[in-house]
Amino acid sequence: MAKKVEGYIKLQIPAGKATPAPPVGPALGQHGVNIVEFTKQFNAKTADQGDLIIPVVITVYADRSFSFITKTPPAPVLIKKACKIQSGSGEPNKKKVAKITKAQVQEIAELKMPDLNAASLESAMSMIAGTARSMGVEVTE
């Protein structure tokens, strides 16, 4: 028989840098999860992903054990990395902060494809391009 699921915890943690400090510690502590064990496993699994922010979904079981699934980094994080900028524009319609090529958009869309609700690469690319435009990043050929 499968273990009884007690809850899910969704967090976004920098790759390889999970610590028992907030927000990780309190979120796991209230479900009775072994915080040190989670941070060790998460850091080992994401150590090769640099400074990207990694979304993680932790499944907590009734016996206080857990499992977790890491997702692909959020699209804005990947766009900022591709454009080498710190943040998007405060006024995306008026002030453009960077440019991104279609090839870079395609690369990001291919990486994000498992987590996107898109049927094809073209629709995934239009989602990523829309995110870029809303950040004040111009999509060029």
From Swiss-Prot:
Q: Give the record's PTM text.
A: One or more lysine residues are methylated.
Which InterPro entries does the entry link to? Ribosomal_uL11, Ribosomal_uL11_bac-typ, Ribosomal_uL11_C, Ribosomal_uL11_C_sf, Ribosomal_uL11_N, Ribosomal_uL11_N_sf
This protein's source sits in the domain of life called: Bacteria
- Keywords on record: Methylation, Ribonucleoprotein, Ribosomal protein, RNA-binding, rRNA-binding
Regions annotated as coiled coil: none
Gene3D superfamilies from the xrefs?
Answer: Ribosomal protein L11, C-terminal domain, Ribosomal protein L11/L12, N-terminal domain
Q: Name one GO molecular function term.
A: structural constituent of ribosome
Q: Name one GO cellular component term.
A: cytosolic large ribosomal subunit
Q: SUPFAM superfamilies in the record, alphabetically?
A: Ribosomal L11/L12e N-terminal domain, Ribosomal protein L11, C-terminal domain
| One GO term (biological process) | translation
Do you know which NCBIfam families this protein is assigned to? Answer: L11_bact (TIGR01632)
Family designation = Belongs to the universal ribosomal protein uL11 family.
Function, in words: Forms part of the ribosomal stalk which helps the ribosome interact with GTP-bound translation factors.
Report quaternary structure and partners: Part of the ribosomal stalk of the 50S ribosomal subunit. Interacts with L10 and the large rRNA to form the base of the stalk. L10 forms an elongated spine to which L12 dimers bind in a sequential fashion forming a multimeric L10(L12)X complex.
Recorded protein name is: Large ribosomal subunit protein uL11
Q: Which organism does this sequence originate in? A: Agathobacter rectalis (strain ATCC 33656 / DSM 3377 / JCM 17463 / KCTC 5835 / VPI 0990) (Eubacterium rectale)
